[in-house]
């Protein structure tokens, strides 16, 4: 379940790819709400607006200006939705490849990288995490289909909106039932 600045997936949690609930997941899994974003047409001399409405592309950086103070508000910050000029790394390991030395890490840092998996909590499938930037429409937290902005102009820099998605690597992780369910005592389907 993706909750963030402007995002929430349309499908149910832990539904494998290829099922009816996720057939259009790549196009509609993230969103922006119209109330959250304060946009305005730029009428400044440095950024002239297009003459005709037909010439304008909705969401292009040339005609959407966002107040940078909007991103300082805590309710609009999310680890799953990001505005950036370049794609973010997928994990903490990729961020610290150059400057991380495994000998200098403390025990707590190692424990966070390798969580304990024997606590009775199992994922329904092996997951794949990706950052997606090519969204055009999505479903917001309230269930409304909204249009996602292509580019955003913040302080004269063009930013893209990236959404963090988690999907199942294999649509059927186990032959029968759900992974992590005791088949001797429970009937399940995924």
UniProtKB/Swiss-Prot annotation:
GO molecular function: growth factor activity; lipid binding; nerve growth factor receptor binding; peptidase inhibitor activity; toxin activity
Annotated tissue distribution: Expressed by the venom gland.
Glycosylation (residues): 134
InterPro entries given in the database record: Cystine-knot_cytokine (IPR029034), Nerve_growth_factor-like (IPR020408), Nerve_growth_factor-rel (IPR002072), Nerve_growth_factor_bsu (IPR020425), Nerve_growth_factor_CS (IPR019846), Venom_nerve_growth_factor (IPR020433)
Keyword Cell membrane: no
Residues making up the signal peptide according to the UniProt record: 1-7
Propeptide residues, chain positions: 8-111
A Pfam match: NGF
GO cellular component: axon; dendrite; extracellular space; synaptic vesicle
Disulfide-bond pairs as recorded: 125-190
One of the GO biological process terms: nerve development
Primary location class: secreted
Similarity section: Belongs to the NGF-beta family.
PANTHER family per the UniProt record, alphabetical: BETA-NERVE GROWTH FACTOR (PTHR11589:SF10), NERVE GROWTH FACTOR NGF -RELATED (PTHR11589)
Description of how the protein assembles with itself and partners: Homodimer; non-covalently linked.
Purpose of the protein: Nerve growth factor is important for the development and maintenance of the sympathetic and sensory nervous systems. It stimulates division and differentiation of sympathetic and embryonic sensory neurons as well as basal forebrain cholinergic neurons in the brain. Its relevance in the snake venom is not clear. However, it has been shown to inhibit metalloproteinase-dependent proteolysis of platelet glycoprotein Ib alpha, suggesting a metalloproteinase inhibition to prevent metalloprotease autodigestion and/or protection against prey proteases.
Protein's recorded name: Venom nerve growth factor
């Amino acid at each position: 379940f993706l909750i963030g600045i402007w995002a929430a997936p349309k499908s149910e949690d832990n539904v494998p790819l290829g099922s009816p609930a996720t057939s259009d997941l790549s196009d509609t899994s993230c969103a922006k709400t119209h109330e959250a974003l304060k946009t305005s047409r730029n009428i400044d001399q440095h950024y002239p607006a297009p003459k005709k409405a037909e010439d304008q592309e909705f969401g292009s950086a040339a005609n959407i200006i966002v107040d940078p103070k909007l991103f300082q508000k805590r309710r609009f910050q999310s680890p799953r939705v990001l505005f950036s000029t370049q794609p973010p790394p997928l994990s903490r390991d990729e961020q610290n490849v150059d400057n991380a030395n495994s000998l200098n890490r403390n025990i707590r840092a190692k424990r966070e990288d390798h969580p304990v998996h024997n606590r009775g909590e199992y994922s329904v499938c092996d997951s794949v995490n990706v950052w997606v930037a090519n969204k055009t429409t999505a479903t917001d937290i309230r269930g409304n289909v909204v249009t996602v902005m292509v580019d955003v102009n913040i302080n004269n820099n063009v930013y893209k909106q990236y959404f963090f998605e988690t999907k199942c690597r294999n649509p059927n992780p186990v032959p029968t039932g759900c992974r992590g369910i005791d088949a001797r005592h429970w009937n399940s389907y995924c």
